[in-house]
Amino acid sequence: MAKKQIDSRTERRVSAQPRLHQRARELQAYGTVNHALPLDLEEPVRVQVTNQLNQLLADTMTLRDLYKKCHWQVAGPTFYQLHLLFDKHYGEQNELVDSIAERIQLLGGVSLAMAADVAETTQIERPPRGREEVSVQLSRLIDAHQIIIQQTRPLARRAAELGDDGTNDLVISEVLRTNELQVWFLSEHLVDVPLVEARERSAAAAGAS
């Protein structure tokens, strides 16, 4: 039997050298979805949901990074507990970032990823580069949470109306509940209660008792 001739021009050479500096066209443009995913969700539905999820993703990534800034820069008598709390909340927000981004990809969309794109998209106010007082840090974080929470219920309702139960579950069970709990922990630090000595009651209050 004659040996098969190998055309050296078409034979792919194996090399241990890395192929560096490669570029190519995008596989998929941002704002689009894959056409033929067997998810039982129409393409217009997935486009609408992924667009809203990307807004939620941008704001969640911004809040996550704001927590890390506060974790590093916090100062004052409550440094220790807030330093730890901010880092705990950062970790929880980071998990939400991953869940939201993967939901976008699962639906056939393209998730935001780069800091510059997130900065252009987020609705959360950009803080200064320097350090701020604890009360201002807490207020900024709560304001950012509020922006996210205001998105969650309408997004969850709309997802349910469109038959996207997976997104509805993610937004309510993970995003909303995590943000609500974190707001509670932050807000209690802004209650003006003495640490060491109770305030004296007014004369009127003392007489009434």
Region spans (language model):
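Acidic/histidine-rich alpha-helical segments that form the ligand environment
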Residues: 98, 102, 116-174
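Helix-loop segments that flank and shape redox-cofactor active sites
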Residues: 40-48, 63-88, 151, 155-167
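A structural signal for well-ordered alpha-helices, especially hydrophobic packing surfaces
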Residues: 57, 64, 71, 90, ...
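Acidic, low-complexity proline/glycine-rich segments
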Residues: 6-38
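Intrinsically disordered regulatory regions flanking bHLH/HLH domains
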Residues: 3, 16-19, 36-40, 44, ...
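Preference for long, well-ordered alpha-helical segments
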Residues: 148-209
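Disorder-to-helix initiation segments
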Residues: 34-56, 134
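Conserved alpha-helical segments that form or flank metal/cofactor-binding pockets of metalloenzymes
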Residues: 68, 74-117
